[in-house]
Amino acid sequence: MTRPTIPPGPPGAEGRTQTLERTETKKPRLWRVLLLNDDYTPMDYVVQVLEQFFRKTEQEAELIMLAVHHKGQGVAGVYTRDVAETKVAQVTAHAQREGHPLRVVAEPESEGE
């Protein structure tokens, strides 16, 4: 078995240790997608949206829908900014096509969360 050869460093570098620098990639800030309560959007439609656009199970969707209904808002999911904004646009367009005033917003998560 042959050993791989390591190319020599620059001239005059014999016997010196070469340091490689690593840059750390900062994780992107996360955004919450919130569904906001209104008096007109049917609860079953909110459940359908959560299942279709946020891949929630029926049970998860019902719990989030109840939070929206009782607390005024519920967290549909937490994503990077681009994904969160896309979800907001998709759900808003779908709700408008279906004739529902469902409001969806994205907000940055707090740094400590």
Curated annotation (Swiss-Prot):
Task: Tell me one GO biological process term.
Answer: proteolysis
- Report the domain of life of the source organism: Bacteria
Task: Enumerate the InterPro entries for this protein.
Answer: ClpS, ClpS_core, Ribosomal_bL12_C/ClpS-like
Q: List the biased-composition ranges (Pro residues).
A: 1-11
- Region of interest (Disordered), ranges: 1-24, 92-113
Family that this chain belongs to: Belongs to the ClpS family.
Report the function annotation for this chain.
Involved in the modulation of the specificity of the ClpAP-mediated ATP-dependent protein degradation.
What is known about its subunit structure? Binds to the N-terminal domain of the chaperone ClpA.
Give the NCBIfam families listed for this entry.
PRK00033.1-5 (NF000672)
Against PANTHER family, the record matches this protein to: ATP-DEPENDENT CLP PROTEASE ADAPTER PROTEIN CLPS, ATP-DEPENDENT CLP PROTEASE ADAPTER PROTEIN CLPS1, CHLOROPLASTIC
Task: Please identify the protein, giving its name as recorded.
Answer: ATP-dependent Clp protease adapter protein ClpS
Q: Which organism is it from?
A: Deinococcus radiodurans (strain ATCC 13939 / DSM 20539 / JCM 16871 / CCUG 27074 / LMG 4051 / NBRC 15346 / NCIMB 9279 / VKM B-1422 / R1)
Originating gene: clpS
